[in-house]
Amino acid sequence: MEALVYTFLLIGTLGIIFFAIFFREPPRLPVKGKK
């Protein structure tokens, strides 16, 4: 069960860092087909 907790914490940390960078620097990719 400990492995599950560590995996959850790891994914949570990576997710927070990813969203922090994403909202700080919006991607300059041309979005097509998005409503």
Swiss-Prot record:
Keywords assigned by UniProt, alphabetized: Chloroplast, Membrane, Photosynthesis, Photosystem II, Plastid, Thylakoid, Transmembrane, Transmembrane helix
Subcellular location, record wording: Plastid, Chloroplast thylakoid membrane
Any one annotated GO CC term: photosystem II reaction center
Highest taxon of the lineage: Eukaryota
Biological processes annotated in GO: photosynthesis
Paired cysteines (S-S): none
Membrane-topology descriptor: Single-pass membrane protein
Chief site of localization: plastid
TM helices/strands, residue ranges: 3-23
Coiled coil: none
Family of this protein: Belongs to the PsbT family.
Function noted in UniProt: Found at the monomer-monomer interface of the photosystem II (PS II) dimer, plays a role in assembly and dimerization of PSII. PSII is a light-driven water plastoquinone oxidoreductase, using light energy to abstract electrons from H(2)O, generating a proton gradient subsequently used for ATP formation.
Subunit structure, interactors included: PSII is composed of 1 copy each of membrane proteins PsbA, PsbB, PsbC, PsbD, PsbE, PsbF, PsbH, PsbI, PsbJ, PsbK, PsbL, PsbM, PsbT, PsbY, PsbZ, Psb30/Ycf12, at least 3 peripheral proteins of the oxygen-evolving complex and a large number of cofactors. It forms dimeric complexes.
Protein's recorded name: Photosystem II reaction center protein T
